[in-house]
Amino acid sequence: MENHTNKTYQERMNKTALSKFDVIEKHLDKGIKLLDFGSGFSPEFIKQVQQTGAHYVAYDVSQIVQNQLKENNIDFLTKEQLVNAEDEFDVIYLSSVFHELMSYLSRPERRETFAMLDKALKPDGVIIIRDWGHGRQPRRPVALEVTSKDVNDEVQTWVEALIKNSIINTPWITEDENDNVIVPYIYKHVPHYLYEIMFHVVWGLGSLERESKESYALDYHHIDKWICQPYNYKIVHQYEEYDETYLPHLQKYFKLDSLPWPTKIIYELKKEAC
């Protein structure tokens, strides 16, 4: 789906440019060739990469993004060019992209995509995935309380859309001692479903149609299944990112003192020696 006509989407992606760069800075140096897969157009991030001396190359299926890259003289690949690339990149970076591949691509399309990336990476290269994820959480139900009646209907609209699109199962809504639903709602479910609700809602209803079709609760099992096992990679480093700039936006909708779950999880993958 074309995200780049949406002003809110582009602004949100550009605001996270610093976090996006921090993840890969240690891998960049003069002569390093980076493929930013599913790049979008983030001028500040591109500038930061180029200032390290690394060679930045973008890849995005969006014609709008390709036009922006072309107008700004940024190197990018078409799909035909990427399909033919072999042992070309030192670093392949998927930032907020893996969950979209899981959400929108068929199984054959996923296999084709990851085979293409494996072929394009140098034997000693690294794949870095930065994406949504709730981390390793207990399976017991927890609560997520809506801030006020003013936003209660908006949150419930998201919940209903996520249920309809099979992103979550129906959460419990807390009742009082007389079996009346408490308003504003207090949702109860296992953490990964509440994670989906919390980070979807913060986009606002203008993004409902697009974002409600995407699953955010990724974990290492997805990466192991689709990349590590088929192509002999190992997750050599994994850590969580807590971006506190999300908190005031989340507090508009939910009673939170701090971020209960990570905003992103980072995975570094290296090819196993044969």
Sequence positions of predicted segments:
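Class I SAM-dependent methyltransferase Rossmann-like catalytic core
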Residues: M1-K26
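Class I SAM-dependent methyltransferase SAM/SAH-binding core
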Residues: F37-L82
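A conserved beta-strand element that flanks and buttresses the S-adenosyl-L-methionine
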Residues: Y93
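A short, conserved alpha-helix within the catalytic core of class I
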Residues: L101-M116
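Short glycine-dipeptide loop
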Residues: L121-I127
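Conserved class I S-adenosyl-L-methionine
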Residues: I128-I168, D179-I186
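Short alpha-helix
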Residues: K213-Y231
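Core SAM-dependent methyltransferase catalytic element
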Residues: Q251-C274
